[in-house]
Amino acid sequence: MLGKDYMLAIILVNCDDDLWGDQNLEGETGLPPGWRKIRDAAGTYYWHVPSGSTQWQRPTWELPGAEDPGRGTEGIWELRPPKGRSFSSLDSSLNRSNSLTWYSEDSYVRSLEPGAKCFAVRSLGWVEVPEEDLAPGKSSIAVNNCIQQLAQTRNRSQPHDGTWGEGQNMLMILKKDAMSLLNPLDHSLIHCQPLVHIRVWGVGSSKGRDRDFAFVAGDKDSCMLKCHVFHCDVPAKAIASALQGLCAQILSERVGVSGEAACCSPDPISPEDLPRQVELLDAVSQAAQKYEALYMGILPVTKAMGMDVLNEAIGTLTARGDRKTWVPAMLSVSDSLMTAHAIQAEAGAEEEPLWQCPVRLVTFIGVGRDPHTFGLIADLGCQSFQCAAFWCEPHAGGLSEAVQAACMVQYQKCLVASAARGKAWGAQARARLRLKRTSSMDSPGGPLPPPLLKGGAGGAGAAPRKRGVFSFLDAFRLKPSLLHMS
């Protein structure tokens, strides 16, 4: 991923393609049972649903030569594949370049509840993942290593250890709050994984691995963390995007329910009431993460978001002066504040930070065209925005993931605080009604403190609650998106 204009944040890639519509699947009269006619960018071909095989030639009906002529021809048709091609398992469709959106009969697809997504996958097995490998800056590397390890052995004949689904073709159904893995032939349940128990997920970032998807979850029987890897029939970013959207929906629904119930319950809401989309966020709130980097400087920008805006600002700062003029700094990232201090030659020396920014003011983060460069845009107020850039070794992946996790923690805190304010407002309203007061009720939620942003000029004053990280993650809450992990 590094080296491309990817943004290592929640709103990386908006998937505009209708990956899950069934308009490309056509039921045509005259086809043998189980066959579907497919039209896509590759052309028109035919798909045998039960076996997963595909062919360019239209399937034909043929009479079995050994049938009794006296029985006639009705009801004894036999399906024979074209010469030189046999009905194989799903392997053939998984390895071809054309992607099939659905892998199931039309009737079963229509029976899925609204919003459910269906994908054809093949289990490649699992690899144990140590807890420490899921820390920010390490989790993406760990998941990618698991994908590479299992993908390389995909075509080798290895004995299975009895793990559910290993080496099998499956249907992955994403709906509501669970991921279900089904047998593609009889739709029997192989495994059901609650989404709130998934620690982290990712898509293969190496060349040729864009159809490999993995997620890490705890195994209740063995009490270990397992990274399960699948090879997908569509680009794996579609699964990641669907999963991201479902988790965002769970998060917003839980907070909405908590806010409505606040008027009836005196109990305060806690972060534990919210689903844990990615538990690596917990590590960010425990202690600040520290990274050594070269502080390139700051630059005013015209917009709060956009990879083009970020790349232009990073390019300007890069061309401004020699690399020797950049200041070696220790960048501290917590769930509330990011601070860059100059690395002092003399022990015990104390100076003002080179740069400081509350996480709640961050509107956009990303890795530049050079994989060593990382930048973020902050909202200074009064429609004023500022970009800060850093040069990282060996690359900016670790820093970008840590900042992204901090933004997610801050977003969860915003949601909890919003629901808590609604609960407090309801309590005040009930109290005032009991006292029969007619005076107006003020909002219990006061303004946020003025932005603290050192290292450059910016507007002062109170910041609205929805500015900064809250608006930055609006896309995560409202529409599916992709976190492409390296």
Curated annotation (Swiss-Prot):
GO terms for cellular component: actin cytoskeleton; cytosol; membrane; nuclear body. The keyword Nucleus applies. InterPro entries: APBB1/2/3, PH-like_dom_sf, PTB/PI_dom, WW_dom, WW_dom_sf. Its main location: cytoplasm. Residues 29-61 form the WW domain. Keywords: Cytoplasm, Nucleus, Repeat. PROSITE patterns: PID, WW_DOMAIN_1, WW_DOMAIN_2. GO terms for biological process: negative regulation of apoptotic process; positive regulation of protein secretion. CDD domains: PTB1_Fe65 (cd01272), PTB2_Fe65 (cd01271), WW (cd00201). It comes from the Eukaryota. Residues 438-460 are annotated as: Disordered. One of its GO terms (molecular function) is amyloid-beta binding. It is found in: Cytoplasm; Nucleus. Residues 113-280, 285-440 form the PID domain. May modulate the internalization of amyloid-beta precursor protein. Interacts with APP (via intracellular domain). Interacts with APLP1 and APLP2 (via intracellular domain). This is Amyloid-beta A4 precursor protein-binding family B member 3.
